[in-house]
Amino acid sequence: MEVCRLENRPLPHAAVEANLLRQVKESAAEGLFKSFQLLVGKDVRENSVRFEVLLGVYANVIEFVKFLETGLAASCINTEFRDLKRMVDGKIQFKVSVPTIAHSDGRRPNKQRQYIVMKCTSKHHISAEIELAIADLENMHMEPETDLDMLEYIGTVKTVTSALQFGIDALERGLIDTVLSVKLRHAPPLFILQSLSDPTLTERGLKKSIKSDLVSMFKDHLITHSFFINKAEALATPRQYILGMLSSIINSVSKETVFKGTSTYTTSSGEPVAGVIETTDAILNKLLTLLGEYKTEVVGPAAYASYVVRGENLVTAVSYGRAMRSFEQFKNKLVDDPVGQAGSLDKNADSDNEYSSLPQTTIPVSVVKVGSQPVIVESIQKMYNEAQAPFPLNRRMQYTYFFPLGLFIPRPKYTTSTSVKLEDDSCLSSEVWVVNKTNTPLCFNYQNALRTLCHPRVNSPSACLQELQRSNLADNALEAFRDGLRSRPMDNMNLFAHVRRFYLKRTEVVLLPIAQKCNLSTDDLLHPTNHKLLQLELHPLFDFVVERVAAEEAAFRATHRTFSGNIPQPLAPNQFQDSRGKQFEAATSLQHAVDDATLEVIRSTAFDPTYPFICYIVEAMIHGQPEKFTMNIPFISLCINTYWDNSGNLAFINSFFMVKNICTHMGGGLINRDAYALYRKILGEVVAIKHAIVRMCGAEQLGNNELQGYVNGLLDRQLLPPFAYRDTFAQLDNRGARFVIGAKEHDNSQAFVHALPDFENANQVAPAMYHTRNTFNWDTFEYITVSNGNNDADAADLEKIYYYVMLPVCTNGHMCGMGADFENIAIVLGYNIPVFDIPQFNGDDTVLEHLENGPLRDILIASEVNPTADMLRMMIVSYLNCPQMTQVVRVKTRRDHCQNLGPEQGAIIEHTVMVNGFVCFGIPERMKQVAKNMFYPVPFHRFYCDPLVAGSWDNHIQNYVMNNFSQRSLEAFNAPPGIMADYAEWHKAPMAKYITSCKASTASLSAFTVMHNKLSPIAFIVQAKHKIHPGFALTVLRTDEVLAENVMFSARASTSVFVGRPTVSRREVRADAVSFEVNHELATIETGLSYSSVVTPAHVASITTDMGIYCQNLFSIFSNEIYDHADVNNYVARKIGVEDAVNRHNPRALIAGVGQISHPPGLVHGQYATCEVIPTPVTADVAYFQKSNSPRGRASCVVSSDINNQERAEQFLYDHSLPDPAYEYRSTVNPWASQKGSLGDVLYGSRYRQVSSPGIYSPSKPFFNKEEMLKNNRSFYTLVNEYAQRLAGYAATSCTDLQYVVINGTDVFLEQPCLFLQEAFPTLSASHRVLLDEYMSFKNTHAPVHMGHYFIEEVAPVKRVFKIGNKVAS
């Protein structure tokens, strides 16, 4: 091969000018292209070998000069190591002396300790490719003879120059990128480093309590120190704040390295540079603008130091902070001066001169002064921008925010602000206002959440039951109940004997959980000691209970709560229901026909011990027959007027039939005008409530059914009035209802209804009636006797409103059902001389003048009523077609199609109708003896089973109540299982609890009416439209993504960079070109004695999501789950905007459950940040949402637990017998989400989300997926332990070879801290728009709670500047 003479200009070892680096580049390129002229040969491909050699030589000369010009090099010891290719990844030993303290108290001095610190080397390979065309290489060999040849030659030179420059620039950028990556790999986040470096923690060791402290400090530092540039912009003195932050950043890292005293970069005045801050262009400009430049250049080496290792054993050692140039020097050091005393400076002078002898040059960089330390500030973002590569200091970070919707704030005893004037001081909000990233106020209300709330998965208990059944039922067998879950048929038709036998044989009292909850406060229910009750509170729409199915076997059952009023009081208190009533009034423009004074008259009547007993007899004789009412108008008028004149109360107010007919037939002056006006008002109020409900529901049809029954239970045809005097059962014949009469069950009313004989034909039927009364065995006569009904739905609705709303509210539930023995009543009335001796006694004479002592006289005297003989005779005539006795019918119907999801047992709802029964109030003791032969109490409905009223009528019930203190309350009173089963009823204990404590006011009427609104999708839709609270609050969860610009600080001499020699290889890619691949090996060693680099997010470049109110659409996720009625599905889909004809005809969606998500045609504020809602009790503490907490309602970060003990970790998460570690006085703030098997758990936990479309994003999943939570907690646990091992105590004393690197998972912690902390940050939100306006005012303090509304400030790492209009939040 021909010898080539190459021109080479090595770097001089002498003083040079400041522009040396530029000269190196120019001289190298010039020499290279002159050498091209020496390439001769016949085959260009052969000559390319020489070009390869040539390229390698000159690449070696000019490579990595740009790196020395960067500020990043100031934090490194840069050394050329020609033998680097022979080195493999390994460990290098450094000997470090640990200083000690000489004590003055006589303690024995410590010996000098030296430790060998093991540092791991890391090798890196960078390469660049240079591709040259064959034609260009041929042109390089030609002798330019003409001008055209010269022009072509010059073009070739330019092409080769460009290719060479491209490759060399790539290598130079590669070195910078490699060093920056190495720095980042050794740079933990500031909030971790500061927390773990706290000496108060490291001195105490890493106990469980310390780890919990660390989590708290992580959160504090994360919120306080993140994005300090943004926070400084809102301050009056941003310079001081930024200097303080930079000082914290600089002081958080270790200044100690194995190269003690080494400083290769100084200012022009000789001050050593403390380190370098690497950041982005935007932050660099902001820092220089605020802080100013201290210096504009630094003095640094213009070349790499030479590093040579000789000898058989390749050992690199640093002793006493001085670098050993060779193994011989290291050996001499150990032999000649092992303790490093005399002459140590002379012996180390050689290593010092290694850096001092390098040529120096000035490098233009920006230097700021933080305290007394000069720090280089630079940005190399331009290099990445030019290469169109992502800048490592730009990161996408995700933060999860949460805010509450619909919380109820009890009326406070005081207020902290008076700036907002509201019409009512006890408002209830059904919306929440948030501010998106463009400072646009947005309203999130229940309409936004309908796509979740209306989904069948939310309205079904199946998933919750499945999880409960997986639990240990043996532990719950002792808590199981047999009574209260389902009714049992009566033995016969003798209602009196059935009730009497139940209370005589009752030896134990059953206090059902549904009743126990009613008598607890919110704090009591959520207390750990009540975890047995709390474990059954899993769902806002369902009651769960343990049923005993065998001697030692139990099973969990779920029944729908049906009405919003059936949510227990601790989770929906009475004051909250009153506020809902006001919303109902406002939405329906309800104008009450009565005033509170009128309702007080009803209440006074119910509690009046002198209520005329004769009124019960009159009511029994009429028993709901209009013709008998008209026959007995004189007697009725006498009772009304007498009682009104004596007490000012209203007679017959316990019967809607009587009230309605009084208003119809007695308006002509037959009774007192004032009394009649009150009757009319009462009836008018019932009509007004009916019209208000209709206005709320609207006039829409749901197929062939009216919509009202799906919204409010009072208009549901499945619910019958509690008292029947006519055939009201026929309307259910075609609705799948079943009727239990005695021990038999029928599916058609015609099978058990006997029509009452027509009163007009009494003469013809009287003998037959007399015969049946005296010959039938009425105990086994399983039929009821009522008059034919007219199926007037409107009249039935008014009757239900009166008995289910008006009477319970006005009487505070001081009522009971009452059965009658009609024959005994007729005997008491008729078997008296003035009554049946017509010739002797004039019909106009009052009976008390001629009446002998007996029950009737006692009754009339006690009632202060003195009727005429004709009045009593007409009353006796009414007995001709009276029924024989009072009966009950147990009505079982299927729930509406929105509430019948889940097990079949829960799809059945029951209630009892008393046939020819009445409502009774309490009676005085003196009347009990007389009354017991005619009437008897029947506790058949939760509103009509007051134990005190029942006990006043029956001694056996009275003894039962007196012997069992828990049975004195309406909601807990046990009733015979044949006529009432609490969990299967329409009206349950919470509604009974409300009526016992509410005021007799129009507000209570409205509240109790809206409490009959159903917990169903259609009801949610209607209430959301009218802004009526549905009965439960929501926790709204949203994850936002920000593009963060980070700041990295690296201390001086914290990394040793070794630059090897390049190798050039040829690789032919195609026939017309030759590629040369330049490979270069690098090595780095982290030299700090602790973490010497740190990174922290400093500035929000942009928020990529809209921070808006777009809510998750569960119908797209679980598209195969539907209701079992096409009209219901179509209505729900149409009203909430999920009607998609494609999905309905798509087999993939129906079979696999894969929905098709509809995407908007365009966006305005950025990518939608999907919100998900978690049902939450309205009594949840608003303070819980004012700081970072778990959206589950219970702390979920188990970093302080043992990761190897999964049982303990799960106990931390789900065991509510233990208090919430974050709030010791309660187990949870949201039992519907924090418990295993709760609605939130099954809705967002991946165990239950059998989704075939994995692309659906769920911000709630990380907080509910148990496996992911435990995995993140294990990672967090490992991360804390690993960092703590490196930072606890003096690191050099460790006998391990721990390296100061970023622990796996740190990037996730930095970019998604909410995953590890298991907490979400509160975002700016207010339950009323005006509170946002107040926040934007000049005030510095703002009331968090104001007149029933609440305001939550944003507490998050991202500090947003809120501006609405011209107002900026202070």
From Swiss-Prot:
Q: Single GO cellular component annotation?
A: T=16 icosahedral viral capsid
Molecular function per GO: structural molecule activity
> Which residue ranges does UniProt annotate as crossing the membrane?
none
The UniProt keyword set, sorted, is:
Capsid protein, Host nucleus, T=16 icosahedral capsid protein, Virion
Q: What InterPro entries does the record point to?
A: Herpes_MCP, Herpes_MCP_upper_sf
Cellular location(s): Virion; Host nucleus
The entry's function note states: Self-assembles to form an icosahedral capsid with a T=16 symmetry, about 200 nm in diameter, and consisting of 150 hexons and 12 pentons (total of 162 capsomers). Hexons form the edges and faces of the capsid and are each composed of six MCP molecules. In contrast, one penton is found at each of the 12 vertices. Eleven of the pentons are MCP pentamers, while the last vertex is occupied by the portal complex.
Q: What subunit structure does UniProt give?
A: Homomultimer. Makes the hexons and eleven out of twelve pentons. Interacts with triplex proteins 1/TRX1 and 2/TRX2; adjacent capsomers are linked together in groups of three by triplexes, heterotrimeric complexes composed of one molecule of TRX1 and two molecules of TRX2. Interacts with scaffold protein; this interaction allows efficient MCP transport to the host nucleus. Interacts with capsid vertex component 2/CVC2. Interacts with the small capsomere-interacting protein/SCP.
Stored HAMAP family: HSV_MCP
Could you say which protein family the record assigns here?
A: Belongs to the herpesviridae major capsid protein family.
Q: What is the protein named?
A: Major capsid protein
Q: Whose protein is this, by species? A: Alcelaphine herpesvirus 1 (strain C500) (AlHV-1)
Q: What phylogenetic lineage does the species belong to?
A: Viruses, Duplodnaviria, Heunggongvirae, Peploviricota, Herviviricetes
